[in-house]
Amino acid sequence: PVNIEILEKCRSWIKQHIFSIDKLVQIDLGKKDYLKIFFEVFEVNEEDNKNRELFIQEDNRYIYPNIYNKSEYIINVKKKVYEDTYGLPYYGINMNRKKPFLKIKTRKTFIPYLLDMDKALLQKQFFEYLMSLAVNGKNNIYIDIKNYRIRAYSDQDERKDFSEISSGYYLRIQKGKELEIQVQDNIVDYQNKLLLNFYYQDFFKMNVENYPEYTKDIGIHLKRTSVGRLINEIFFSKYLLTNYFTDASDISVKDSVLKRTIVMYRNVIFDWIYKGIDNNFELAERRFSLDLIKNALINNYTLRAMTQLNLHWSFKDYFTELKQQGGEKMAEIATEIRESIKERVTSKEEVKMPINDKEYYYAVGQIAAYFISLSKAGKKSQSMINLVINISDDRVLKERLIQLYKKYNYAIDHYNVRFKNLFAMILGYKPAAQTDRQTKDEMILFGYMDSNSIYTKKEENN
């Protein structure tokens, strides 16, 4: 029953203060918003909590009518001498007449699942707890069922207190009109700390002072989330993080290649970063990285393309070391190729052929960049790299280079020995048929974006 005395006391206070409440508390009555007023049950210095039962009673008046989805989805189950109430909880599933597909019509009770009042209340408290985390930007929830703890992090958090979860759950939540659980998955042996340190390297020897924005992240990265930040910023120009769960039609990215890549690969990237699922990530990275590098270059973002190749080759070294495959690292390969081609280009002796296919395709990238540099066009579009990057037949590739030579030879000095050496070694070398397309494209891009050996000043011996 309602305590009439307390009810009238509250009613009287409302009538007396409602139109001057802004004088009691800081509030803007001009706003079109709801105003909630709460009355304390306990007195200021009350020690024996006389009204404790009243507090619980009023709390229950509000909670229990709202704990279930609808009254029509509540049933009473008789157990011996008493009845238990079960219903479809308000949180977790929203069932109404517009969603008849949620009904399970093959059984007597069509309601998808039922909870008793205690469990429904517990679920309500859990969802409210999750909502408070979502409101504060803590979107990544890790539930450790072995150590009985919950950890919540934003995408930017360093996670210094987070080590591993041997068994548990992962939730990705978002605040919408209600709490949205965007992803739920079981987690087994998840570690944010990488098994091996990830070394983000600079293969182009970029000048740190001239390009601080592009070199600031060079170095060791210990955690998946740290590497995930590199993926988001370098590969996806910061568009991935905000579009993991956006409907494809709602992704506001004008670049069609970037948008398509986000839609195709965001799930496997998300799983690797936040769930520790390694399956397919290496293969996916190998595919999308090359597409994004080419796309950046075609759109005249050369520095971005260089950092993307840096990150891709850093991943290549990481996975090679992780699988203990051995062999040379990409930094060694890049340096050897650069120095070998430079030595051949600057030589005044007889022309020497490239040692292997990697050197050959690097040289192709170098000569393509040189031809484009000779263009008299006011705006030199990097899309000209398409003339050589998308050719699979070597004979056609050489014919295309000869066409470029005929187009720009008016600007080439007859005594340009470096050009002659570079062009001669390309025309005189026949690559192996088994060279894979990925390696070919990577080396052409590397040669194209690297400092050009025709223009590089010759080092003089002391």
What are these regions (language model features)?
Residues 1-5, 11-12, 174-462:
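Long, contiguous all-alpha helical interaction modules
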